[in-house]
Amino acid sequence: MYYNFEWDPKKDKRNSRKHGVTFEQAATVFQDPRSLSLFDAGHSVKEEDRWITLGLSTTGGLLVVHHTFDELDTETINIRIFSSRKAVKPEIKQYSE
């Protein structure tokens, strides 16, 4: 399976200033075999399913990433990242269990 990542560069800059996490860093959580992806029913709409993934980045930080999944073909999934931040204590506990 191949992952293709995309994001809005302006949102990436705002997110980096606000949360100290770039979307490039956030994309690395999808390499974590222990990452946990949950459907975000509260923010999904009919036209777009949204997801939240909790995982370890390649820099060692535990991150929460808000994104979409879009299957481009049988081999490729497009992931559009629109928010990311460092995990807080309850999320760290959830990841550890």
Where are these regions (language model features)?
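Ribonuclease/tRNase effector modules and their secretory precursors
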Residues: 1-97
